[in-house]
């Protein structure tokens, strides 16, 4: 009974702390036509302190989405265009000698912002990618002999173009695993496309004004961490991730030859975190199986390695995740 009272009290607090979510979503909807899944994913990443890898062809409002979100929160935004000649110092910053003061001064790089768009992350060499990924993991950057904390909240949205893969530096599996979500975005619907044409021809880009603050986001994060996950839901999350490693244990023998490696414990942690954030967005103080299923594809698609057999059969990690969540017993 005490637990029920706690949940009730938590629901009231969630109702209070999540009021800004409606304002954020409506603010995004005024600027971004369609792409609801992209907006939801950005909110999940923001509320659960996770980073997002976005895959989609150019022109699908990836840059506009994160820029609009930063304006709605009145936060700093920066964009890094990854190119083959980029250096780690171009991302994190460097020491510059000042002749006037006769000493070295720190010049901070574009990574020092609340929202960082790493555009076409697979266009830059591995040492540049790892400089950004280290900053993402540690939430701090070392320039010279000094260590600097990155702003809070700190959200990186990296993009990849799935078509032009020539001359790129694909992210290693260990690096990809650091992204909480990998979101694949698709073209808008026919009606959405017509609306985009109308708005752009009219030249009416709505003005974006802040609807919340970075402090409100940090308060909301602490409430998200309190969202209740029952033991049965924990078991459900663990079963889904274990099914990516040992499919034959879950009557999925046909997947055994398709998967070269499954999700790490980081997959389980991120699945739980994302499900909590999703429950918060839905104004609930507890996680239900539907929350887990809603975020499973985005959390797991980049954490499953495919065998040559799977690739030859045109089986995608997307299909594997779908088979797993349809087979694993729901509590």
Place the predicted regions along the sequence by residue.
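P-loop (Walker A) phosphate-binding loop of NTP-binding proteins
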Residues: 57, 91, 159
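Walker A/P-loop
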Residues: 46-83
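Canonical AAA+ ATPase core
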Residues: 98-103, 120, 124, 128, ...
């Amino acid at each position: 009974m005490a637990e029920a009272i706690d949940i009730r009290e938590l629901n009231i607090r969630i109702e209070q702390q999540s009021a800004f979510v409606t304002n954020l979503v409506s603010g995004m909807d005024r600027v971004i036509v369609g792409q609801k899944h992209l907006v939801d994913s950005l909110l999940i990443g923001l509320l659960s302190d996770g980073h997002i890898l976005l895959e989609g062809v150019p022109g699908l409002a990836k840059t506009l989405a994160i820029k609009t979100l930063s304006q709605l929160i009145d936060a700093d935004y920066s964009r890094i265009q990854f190119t083959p000649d980029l250096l780690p110092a171009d991302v994190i910053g460097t020491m510059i000698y000042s002749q006037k003061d006769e000493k070295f001064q720190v010049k901070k790089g574009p990574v020092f912002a609340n929202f960082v768009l790493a555009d076409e992350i697979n266009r830059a060499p591995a040492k540049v990618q790892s400089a950004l990924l280290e900053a993402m993991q540690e939430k701090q950057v070392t320039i010279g002999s000094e260590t600097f904390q990155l702003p809070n909240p700190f959200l990186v949205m990296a993009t990849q173009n799935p078509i032009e893969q020539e001359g790129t530096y694909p992210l290693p599996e260990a690096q990809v695993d650091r992204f909480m979500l990998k979101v694949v975005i698709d073209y808008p619907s026919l009606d959405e496309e017509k609306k985009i044409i109308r708005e752009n021809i009219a030249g009416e880009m709505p003005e974006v004004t802040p609807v919340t603050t970075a402090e409100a986001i940090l308060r909301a994060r602490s409430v998200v961490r309190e969202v209740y996950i029952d033991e049965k839901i924990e078991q459900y999350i663990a079963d889904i991730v274990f099914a990516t490693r040992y499919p034959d244990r879950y009557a999925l023998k046909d997947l055994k030859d398709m998967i070269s490696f499954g999700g790490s414990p980081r997959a389980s942690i991120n699945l739980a975190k994302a499900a909590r954030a999703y429950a918060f967005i839905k104004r609930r103080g507890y996680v239900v199986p539907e929350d887990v299923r809603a975020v499973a594809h985005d959390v797991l698609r980049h954490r499953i390695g495919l065998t040559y057999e799977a690739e030859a059969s045109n089986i995608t990690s997307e299909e594997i995740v779908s088979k797993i969540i349809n087979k694993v017993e729901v509590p």
